[in-house]
């Protein structure tokens, strides 16, 4: 006997003209999140979710692809103007911002909110290759 097909509730499109982009660029991955001004997530994408695995996740191209995916989904929800917050030391910072600009968003501001320790935890030892 076949199981009845489950019909889920389809997510409704919100109309949010102004939003905020959070770019979290670590050494291993880049995560891009589009939110409304209150911080509720509209769309998100990451290098790993975009199909890149292993060391290719940390490349600028992977960050660009992820940013384009998240940006298109945010545009479907009516977003036109964004402010950008960038966090982390990763290589995908610049390319993600360029991709968001290329999709057609009007960028209101760009802020770097990378946390800088005031001599907090001891960092990992230097790599010897």
Curated annotation (Swiss-Prot):
The protein's name: Small ribosomal subunit protein uS11
Primary role: Located on the platform of the 30S subunit, it bridges several disparate RNA helices of the 16S rRNA. Forms part of the Shine-Dalgarno cleft in the 70S ribosome.
Species, as recorded: Lawsonia intracellularis (strain PHE/MN1-00)
UniProt xrefs under InterPro entries: Ribosomal_uS11 (IPR001971), Ribosomal_uS11_bac-type (IPR019981), Ribosomal_uS11_CS (IPR018102), Ribosomal_uS11_sf (IPR036967)
Q: Which gene encodes it?
A: rpsK
Family assignment from sequence similarity = Belongs to the universal ribosomal protein uS11 family.
Q: Does the keyword Glycoprotein apply?
A: no
**Entry keyword set:** Ribonucleoprotein, Ribosomal protein, RNA-binding, rRNA-binding
HAMAP family membership: Ribosomal_uS11
Per UniProt, subunit arrangement is:
Part of the 30S ribosomal subunit. Interacts with proteins S7 and S18. Binds to IF-3.
Please give the biological process terms from Gene Ontology that the record holds. Answer: translation
* Superkingdom of this protein's organism: Bacteria
Q: Name one Pfam family in it.
A: Ribosomal_S11
Gene Ontology terms, cellular component aspect?
ribonucleoprotein complex; ribosome
What molecular function does GO assign, one term?
A: structural constituent of ribosome
Kindly indicate whether the keyword Cell wall biogenesis/degradation belongs to this entry: no
What range does the record give for the signal peptide? none
């Amino acid at each position: 006997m076949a199981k009845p097909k489950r019909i889920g509730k389809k997510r409704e499109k919100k109309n949010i003209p102004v939003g905020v982009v959070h770019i979290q660029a670590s050494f291993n991955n880049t995560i891009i999140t589009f939110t409304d001004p209150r911080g509720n997530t509209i769309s998100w994408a990451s290098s790993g979710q975009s199909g890149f695995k292993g060391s290719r996740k940390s490349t600028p191209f992977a960050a660009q692809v992820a940013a384009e995916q998240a940006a298109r989904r945010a545009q479907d929800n009516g977003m036109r103007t964004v402010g950008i917050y960038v966090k982390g030391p990763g290589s995908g910072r610049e390319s993600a911002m360029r991709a968001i600009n290329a999709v057609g968003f009007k960028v209101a501001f760009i802020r770097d909110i990378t946390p800088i320790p005031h001599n907090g935890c001891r960092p990992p030892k230097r790599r010897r290759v």
